[in-house]
Structure formats: structure tokens, C-alpha cells
Amino acid sequence: NNGTSIDNAKLTIAGAVSIAQSGTTIKVLSGNYVESNPIELPAFTALVGDDLRTVKVLPSTTTSDIFHVNKGCKIANMTFSGHVHPAAAVAFPTGIATNVGGGKWKGPYIQNCTSDTTTGTGIFIDGDKAVKTKSMNVDAFTQYNQGGVGVAVTNEGYAQLVSVFTICCNEAITVHKGGQADLANSNCSFGTFGLVADGVGD
């Protein structure tokens, strides 16, 4: 299948992402997707599921990140499950997220998603893996990571977090080595630690 229409859809998210170009929106229909991971989204692409209750993405390698995002990416309306420490559902690439096209940085945007796992992390923002403001933007993300971490920001990375709800996490929101998180309209239920900060930036 060439992935250009619903009747000719790619069978995997990774397959669809492999042909995506800047400006592409990939529609993910309801179902459970076990994917070869990590899947790296090109800059300025969007991955949009039918609904977070009906689209579930699971990694074939549970200790590796599920998605790596670049400048201007968006992921919406899906549940991530099965990733375990040290993996995150969403992170910057292992190389670096460059400022494609120049100008101001447009952080990856994660909206209306759920991370449902054990020791894994929902979002890991490592400032050493991106440029400019080294940031991601989050709206409506539930983190049900039992014994894991909701959002981790390190190495002078930056997170704008709105409506992030953590349940049973060992650490809900954590910042290290100069990382910064702006947090609004969010809460931490159960779990061990709510807000954790340590270390200093360069």
C-alpha cells in the first residue's frame, strides 16, 4: 500500500511516517499498533489518532522510546502503553532536533494523549537533544505510569505543560540540570513525589 488514502493505507504507523514529508498529517485509525521503535517524525508533520480511547501504540522494544519528535511536530489523540524504564513515550531524537527552516523554534506539541504503563516515562525533554528553546508543548496529557515518571525535563530543556494529570507515578513532574517546566491546570494523584527538582544548569 502506498499510504495515500484510507483504502490504500499503510499497515503500521512506522510505515506511514517513513513516507511523510513536511506538512503531512498522518491519520491513525482505531486499533492497537505494535510498532518497531523508536519512530522519528520529520519536522512539521502531525500524527493524529481517531481517539485516545481507541488508538493504542505499543513498542516492540519496550526499553526504547516510542516516538522521537522534531521541530513543529504534533502527536494527538492516542494512548501509549508498554514502554518501561528507561524508555519514554515521546522524546527528542537521539541525534538532535535541529531548527529546520530557521527562524524561531516551534516546539513539538503533544495533545489529548495518555501514557499508561509501569516504570516508563510519558515525556522526556533532554535539552542536549534540541536547539534554541529546547522545548515541547503539552495539552491534556494523562500520565498513568505506575512507578514511572510523568514528565522529565533535563539539561536546560523547557516544557509548557497544561492539563497534565499524573496518577501513581513515582515522580510526577521532574526537572534536572537546569530544566524548566511551566505547569498550569494540572494535578498529581497518588504516587510518591509530585514536583522534583535537582542539579543546576551550565
Residue ranges of predicted features:
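Short, surface-exposed connector motifs at secondary-structure boundaries
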Residues: A20-T24, Q143-Y144, F165-T166
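Short glycine/acidic-rich loop motifs that flank beta-strands on beta-rich extracellular proteins
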Residues: S36-P38, L52, L58-S64, H83-T94, ...
